Amino acid sequence: LPIHTSTQMTITNVEGARLLKEQGVERVVTAREMSLEEIQRIHDEVGVELESFIHGALCYCYSGQCLFSSIIGGRSGNRGRCAQPCRLSYEVMDEKKHPVKTGKKERDLYILSPKDLCTVSMIPELIENGVDSFKIEGRMKQPEYAAGVVSVYRKYIDYYINACLRTDEVTAKKDFKVTKEDIQHLYDFGNRSGFTDGYYKRHNGREMITLDKPSHTKGNEALWEEIKEQYVRSEKKEKINGILRLKKDCPAKLEVALNDIRTSVDGDVVQAALKQPLAEEKVAASIKKTGNTPYEFAELDIDM
């Protein structure tokens, strides 16, 4: 089983990644707090597979290492049970514990609440700097959110890779653009007072913090309903190929294949029709009724 390490191991440098590779790790999920240059350095000097977060919630502390939730409520962030106290409002005080005037009421100041990460416009740079796998944060999110966000990123990853194949990386990167409509879709799927590109291009930044509204808001209910119809309510079925053999005085036999997996089943002995013989089209229509199973026929041959 390939070993992948979590972002909660807080791997932020070459030395940490190299140690894990020596221990047999095949893929490192980098800390969210890393820059593009730091990721590039691990890629160049260690040669381990790298997976990085590209969208979703950011942690105020190093990912998963915050003890705030554990201390005040016994819910460990490093076990995926963070109560997110960073989303509450706090008063700012100076070293003498005097309130600092911020122009906002205490209850309206969210100084520990980061905005959500969004890097769809950085896809060429992320690939160029050595990210092998993109990770979208989706803990406790609705299926519509996951489906919608993934569909936007999938669109532009494929767009960029296909452009590289048609031309070259320099031209593809130069021509890469994300439409305002798709950016708005990402906002509608959910955001916290807008988006940030996190630490990829800067160490820290005031614009990373929500300050005003820490809640995860969504918009455009029509878009959510469209995503629900397209991805959530409609069950995706695997395409299978089959052949039905119907020979007189022999058991009926159905052979089915899904990629490299093959199986077959025998039925009753086929007998000659007393009156109206079965038409091939009618037999095929009956066999293709797969009901509530997760399969549907791509091809079905009838040998009779």
Report residues per predicted region.
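N-terminal active-site wall of soluble small-molecule enzyme domains
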Residues: 1-19
